[in-house]
């Protein structure tokens, strides 16, 4: 049976086009309680006390919990497998609710009520006394010598991680490249450029807001139904946050209305679990607003890239350097991995004859936490690399296509980070085909002679995408297939269907491997 590669109907198609597909909010039971998060109104400081008197007078309020009530357990939120090597484990830097405020809108308390309106009214009536500190908004302020650490129990400064990478000699520096080039070429034969480029924060803007509901069954097992990309990791982190065995926690992931990496983080599931435990196991629903999602969940990293490039007048890149400074916000999330991934990809695009030097700094600030977002640091790397490439080509007056063809990676390149050889690159052919298809040479020549405030132009860029965590962590994958009594098969795996067609593709793979019909795999 050869079904892989064949056109089949998606296994989730009917439910999605008819509206029968059930998302998290569609599955909640009747008479469910509603939670509302109380957020800090300062960006940096300490919660001293709460006055809950007026809030408890709102009809329908069942319980109010604060940062003084939650377990004293710090946990990570990144959607990574738990590394066996301690230095590569995700950073445990937050609690279910935080007394130490690190951003405007930090989670400090929560209201449980009979309906959403009562919960929201009570949340607005809670009075909070703070000890306020000066916010640390920029990377420059966070890295200043006199900057106060936002996580003094974990770091003596605000640098989450500094990743140093080179290509060429292991101790290569850009300054070494300058010296070596100076001894091989005359000053009129080489050009050294220094440029600075920035990328902004971006919100994921998925249609379905972060939503979950939770309950405790008669055996004391905590179940959280959540719109998440990482149910198994949410299970581990929720147990860690509550201080209970993992076996007591169950996570159910229904259909997901978009995530794009924001839901590859543990968001409000631990709080939701704590809320249901606080009311004797009654089901509690917790959905945050669009405003809360943008300010309080995750964003793409804003990264400042300070770049240097050394090139010969005939168009050969000799050396490049990237100093990347990532504004990670208040909590670590995926940050320690994303900026490093950005640096890794920067050095993989071009073959610098003398070498490449990369330093990546991921920094805590008093701002929304940055985490996973589509392509995981690679858009920033491509922006830095391609802006620098265009500027180098412009500095020597060379066509950008020609410049890239002369310097881009080719078949046989060995990535020094993991030893993987590039056996099928095809990049040069891609550039040449694109060049021919859009009539690049003709347009490049004619557009260069324009004047005036409004002009036409053509541009091009390349990038590479790498995936996986080797050699930092083990690459593992597994699935379980259960043969049912009627000859059909139940397929169980950790991969999450989030619109990309994973359930359909894995069903095809299971069908072809076992010989069981495609429509008999569930």
Model-derived features with residue positions:
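General beta-strand structural signal in soluble alpha/beta enzymes
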Residues: 19, 63-67, 103, 193-197, ...
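Alpha-helical support elements that line or immediately flank enzyme active sites
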Residues: 37-71, 109-130, 212-280, 337-348, ...
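Glycine-rich loop/linker segments at domain edges
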Residues: 6, 12-15, 86-87, 158-212, ...
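Flexible, low-hydrophobicity surface segments
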Residues: 1-161
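Helix-loop-helix junctions that connect adjacent transmembrane helices in secondary transporters/permeases
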Residues: 148-242, 408-488
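Short coil/turn connectors at secondary-structure junctions
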Residues: 31-34, 58-62, 98, 105-108, ...
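Flexible, glycine/charged-enriched surface loops at secondary-structure junctions
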Residues: 134-140, 398-407, 441-455, 518-522
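Short, surface-exposed loop/turn segments at secondary-structure boundaries that line and modulate
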Residues: 65-106, 141-154, 233, 250-272, ...
């Amino acid at each position: 049976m050869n079904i892989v590669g064949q056109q089949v109907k998606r296994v989730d198609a009917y439910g999605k086009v008819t509206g029968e597909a059930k998302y998290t909010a569609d599955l909640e039971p009747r008479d469910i309680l509603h939670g509302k998060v109380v957020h800090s109104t300062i960006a940096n400081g300490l919660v001293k006390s709460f006055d809950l008197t007026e809030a408890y007078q709102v009809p329908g309020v069942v319980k109010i919990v604060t940062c003084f009530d939650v377990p004293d357990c710090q946990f990570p939120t990144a959607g990574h497998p738990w590394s066996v090597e301690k230095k590569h484990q995700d950073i445990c830097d937050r609690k279910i609710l935080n007394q130490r405020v690190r951003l405007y809108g930090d989670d400090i308390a929560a209201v449980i009520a009979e309906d959403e309106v009562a919960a929201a009214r009570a949340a607005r009536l809670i009075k909070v006394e703070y000890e306020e500190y000066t916010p640390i908004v920029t990377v420059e302020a966070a890295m200043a010598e006199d900057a106060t650490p936002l996580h003094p129990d974990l770091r003596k400064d605000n640098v989450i991680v500094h990743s140093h990478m080179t290509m060429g000699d292991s101790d290569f520096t850009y300054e070494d490249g300058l010296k070596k080039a100076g001894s091989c070429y005359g000053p009129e034969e080489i050009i050294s450029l220094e440029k600075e480029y920035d990328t902004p924060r971006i919100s994921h803007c998925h249609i379905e807001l972060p939503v979950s509901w939770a309950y405790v069954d008669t055996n004391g097992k905590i179940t959280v139904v959540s719109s998440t990309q990482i149910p198994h990791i949410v299970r581990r982190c929720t147990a860690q946050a509550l201080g209970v065995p993992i076996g007591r926690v169950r996570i159910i992931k229904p259909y997901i209305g978009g995530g794009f990496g924001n839901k590859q983080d543990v968001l409000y599931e631990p709080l939701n679990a704590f809320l249901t435990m606080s009311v004797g196991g009654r089901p509690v629903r917790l959905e945050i607003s669009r405003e809360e999602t943008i300010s309080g969940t995750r964003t793409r990293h804003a990264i400042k890239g300070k770049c240097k490039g050394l090139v010969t007048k005939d168009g050969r890149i000799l050396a490049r350097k990237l100093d990347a400074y990532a504004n990670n916000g208040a909590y670590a999330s995926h940050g320690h991995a994303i900026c490093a991934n950005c640096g890794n990809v920067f050095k993989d695009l071009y073959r610098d004859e003398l070498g490449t030097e990369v330093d990546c700094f991921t920094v805590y600030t008093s701002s929304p936490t940055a985490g996973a977002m589509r392509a995981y640091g690679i858009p920033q790397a491509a922006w830095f690399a391609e802006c620098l490439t265009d500027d180098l080509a412009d500095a020597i007056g060379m066509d950008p296509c020609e410049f890239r063809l002369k310097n881009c990676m080719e078949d046989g390149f060995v990535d020094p980070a993991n030893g993987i050889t590039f056996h099928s690159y095809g990049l040069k052919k891609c550039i040449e085909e694109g060049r021919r298809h859009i009539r690049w040479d003709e347009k490049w020549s004619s557009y260069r002679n324009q004047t005036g405030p409004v002009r036409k132009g053509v541009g091009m860029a390349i990038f590479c995408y790498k995936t996986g965590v080797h050699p930092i962590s083990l690459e593992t994958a597994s699935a379980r297939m259960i043969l049912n009594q009627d000859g059909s098969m139940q397929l169980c795996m950790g991969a999450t269907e989030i619109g990309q067609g994973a359930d359909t593709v894995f069903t095809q793979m299971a069908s072809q491997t076992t010989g069981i019909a495609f429509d008999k795999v569930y």
